[in-house]
Amino acid sequence: MLSILNNNGKPYVQMVTAGFSGCRAYRCDFPATAINWTGGIGVHVIEVPMPLLDNGILNATRAFMFKSPGNAVCYDMVCQLADIKDKAGFRLVADYDDQPVYIKGCISLPWEPWGPTKHKLEDDQWFIKMAPLFDTITVTNEYLARELDAITNTHNYVVVPNTVPRWLFSAPRKPQLAEDKTKFVVVGSGCPLHSTGPHKDENGKDVEGQPGDWASAEWIDFIKEGVSEGYIDYIQMGGPNWMLEDIKDKIRTLPWVPPLRFPSLISRLNADVVLAPLVDCVFNKCKSDLRLIEANVCSSAIMCSTFADGPYENAHQLCKVSQGATKDQLKDILFTLGKKDNWNEVIEYGWRNILDNGRITESDQALERYVKLFGSTPEKVVPFDIM
């Protein structure tokens, strides 16, 4: 009879995933692909919508990793696995990247149309119930680990930063500048749910538009002036930005694309500068620095909002934008970045950030983080019968 047990003992990791978001792509799909093609780290990842509990597969499973579990169905699955994990010899791991959780009051963004919904609060309660059942919970930054542990008091949080897959971000490394830049290809993006255009409520009453993260500085005025004066060639990703409606014929707008297509798309744009606006709030402190490392791997500079415990504190000093910055200050930052010596330093700094800190998905340092989560190869496998 064919057996999936082999000399590695327990070679399989079951990643229980759902959805098609960028969170799943960067936290599950891309790492799983890199782990599986190397073959030399002793595990093979199987992405599944629910745990596979056939005796043969279960006895070959070293770990179950759940992506953002937060409902009654997930809770039931995790409870059942927690009851048998010690006897069956596997680890239970959960991953929450920027999962909205109830930290210091409502974490919902104030401009989200749904506000602090019952749905989100219910998610938080399931999370709190499940937290003690996991051997390890991975998150993307120290702030999220610290704040979640203050709620659950489980001390099982490990920071696993996001990484970028070099095989998908395939743009060649840009050469150094020989002269200063005076014109810039600038790319802005962001979830359309993080800003709300003017609309009518359920009673037909007019509701003013909310700018969301674009309110963190005079970003919109800065973009409009740059486009008008010809020093910014602006590309809006993720669909139309309602605040740029009056210059829509002077800019390029690209629709949302699936996560697997996004890296090659943004690489082909050959952006000089990527905009990363964020307001200073709890939700954004829970976010990762993904936009920063995406810019780094594309040899692009970035202009990013910074604040205490924010995700972009590791950006080059010349790239940082303070809360409330004026359009003139933003313009000064842009042209300061365009000075050839500054530009070359910033781009090199970005590459050193991702290479030296294991922020490339297929790097040994990045893969080792996952191997540690899944546990070492057992010396002896004792078969377990789930029946």
PLM feature segments, named:
Residues G19-W37, N162-R268:
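Conserved catalytic-core segment of nucleotide-activated headgroup transferases in glycan assembly
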Residues K85-H119:
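Active-site proximal beta-strand in glycosyltransferases
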Residues G338-I386:
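A charged, aromatic-enriched C-terminal amphipathic alpha-helix characteristic of glycosyltransferases
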